[in-house]
């Protein structure tokens, strides 16, 4: 898991990992999928699935802290504002040799460019929400979300 994704890879994930439909039940399944991945790997994370202007799934594993919820909020806000995964935003700014949180138009209390938040998109519709994980190094938070989305989208397409 040490290999970095290229910006092109990250944009490809965003293009590929879109739902044909998404509702409250889908949000619940996505949250449960993330919880299962975390438990199977004995990782301590906080999870949020936010869509349609509300939190549809939230879970904090025993051992997580309030800080994880604060990170979730900041990551989510970044995706909602910029329309890309929080990991992409961080890598994009890194490629530009700048710190995202130090830019004049960014309030670091509200936004952060650390991996773990990913846009929830409905094909031919657009951004409807954000799925976020906090508790691991940013690359691993991002990968956990990618794994859960990949599994869920495949299972939904089969049914």
Swiss-Prot record:
Segments traversing the membrane: none
UniProt similarity note: Belongs to the UPF0303 family.
Protein name: UPF0303 protein Ping_1243
Organism whose genome encodes this protein: Psychromonas ingrahamii (strain DSM 17664 / CCUG 51855 / 37)
Leader peptide range in chain numbering: none
